[in-house]
């Protein structure tokens, strides 16, 4: 097994490489994708009309599509899966597309909220499991959700979105299916990847609800004063198999994670591991990639607060964010202190009911969220 570590430096160097290095641009375009990859990616021209995401069906006036679309796209690209059977599959059993989003058990309220809000799918709570599933498998529900997130995808899961949309479109256009459940409905007009600024919509809120966290480290220094260190972290992992006859390595999470690092003006850390499989598998090996953004600088944490105040988290991480923000603001106003009511004491007290140790949950933040029209 071979591990390699990289640090992608912030603002200046990333832009310079992107604009001035043809070799770098090429490398960026051939990085591996998550499950299924980008394959032979089809490109679609933007019609610059993200507002009209539901076509030829009842428009739900309760939904704020401009905010719901990016949030759900981020959530699905983080902890969701769009399952579409390959058209070339030789399996006798055929199945239509389905969308699955996984929530930890504590976030059952959020799963139910999104299910009821979109009127798509069902929520399943597994007995003796620490997670719940939001499952959308009916054609109308899949059609609706694909329309909502259309134009807001930012990661390699866009490829699965495209295959799902194409399946739906082929189904709509089919003249051989007698019982077409999507008659008199327009095709999904597939839009390209969203390359807008990270701070322009709620995509990062959805992704953070899935894969981000707000941490508090307590450093008990000997030669220097003890400190409470708050930081925001987002890490995305991917893997794929490659053999001597397969050189189709495509897009990865590198681009989107670089954009997030650039937005907060921090470094992007990456790690890779090569795992050789059986020789009989034609020199096949599996590649693992990990990309991590960490925001620990006090002033940059303020920008984190500004973003998530504008586009609130909706999971129980919202409660962790509120506590985390208290510590960041206290340190910003008064500095580090081990005195009574100082940052050290606050950090200790917050961690008693925080992240994995949290036992107190409230859901008032799910009332009249920004995903709904007021």
Short names for language-model regions:
Residues 1-374:
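Internal intein/HINT superfamily modules and their associated LAGLIDADG
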């Amino acid at each position: 097994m071979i591990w390699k570590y990289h640090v992608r430096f912030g603002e200046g160097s990333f832009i310079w490489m992107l604009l001035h290095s043809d070799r770098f641009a090429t490398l960026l375009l051939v990085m591996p994708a998550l499950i299924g990859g980008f394959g032979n990616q089809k490109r679609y021209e933007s019609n610059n009309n993200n507002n009209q995401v539901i076509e030829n069906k009842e428009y739900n006036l309760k939904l704020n599509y401009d905010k719901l679309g990016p949030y759900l796209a981020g959530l699905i690209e983080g902890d969701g899966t769009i399952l579409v059977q390959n058209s070339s599959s030789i399996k006798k059993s055929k199945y239509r597309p389905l969308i699955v989003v996984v929530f930890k058990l504590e976030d059952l309220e959020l799963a139910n909220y999104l299910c009821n809000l979109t009127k798509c799918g069902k929520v399943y709570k597994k007995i003796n499991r620490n997670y719940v599933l939001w499952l959308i498998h009916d054609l109308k529900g899949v059609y609706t959700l694909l329309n909502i997130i259309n134009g807001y995808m930012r990661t390699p899961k866009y490829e699965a979105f495209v295959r799902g949309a194409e399946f739906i479109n082929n189904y709509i256009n089919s003249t051989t299916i007698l019982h077409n459940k999507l008659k008199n409905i327009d095709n999904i007009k597939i839009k390209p990847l969203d390359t807008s600024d990270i701070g322009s919509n709620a995509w990062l809120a959805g992704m953070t609800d899935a894969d981000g966290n707000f941490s508090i480290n307590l450093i008990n220094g000997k030669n220097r004063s003890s400190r409470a260190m708050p930081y925001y972290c987002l890490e995305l992992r991917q893997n794929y198999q490659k053999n001597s006859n397969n050189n189709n390595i495509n897009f990865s999470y590198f681009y989107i994670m670089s954009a997030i690092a650039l937005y907060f003006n921090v470094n992007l850390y990456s790690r890779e591991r090569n795992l050789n499989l059986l020789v009989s598998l034609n020199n096949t090996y599996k590649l693992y990639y990990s990309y991590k953004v960490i925001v620990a600088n006090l002033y940059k944490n303020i920008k984190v607060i500004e973003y998530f105040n504008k586009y609130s988290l909706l999971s129980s991480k919202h409660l962790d964010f509120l506590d985390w923000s208290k510590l960041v603001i206290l340190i910003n106003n008064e500095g580090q202190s081990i005195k009574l009511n100082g940052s050290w004491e606050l950090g200790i007290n917050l961690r008693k009911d925080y992240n994995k140790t949290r036992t107190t949950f409230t859901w008032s933040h799910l009332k009249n969220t920004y995903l709904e029209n007021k």
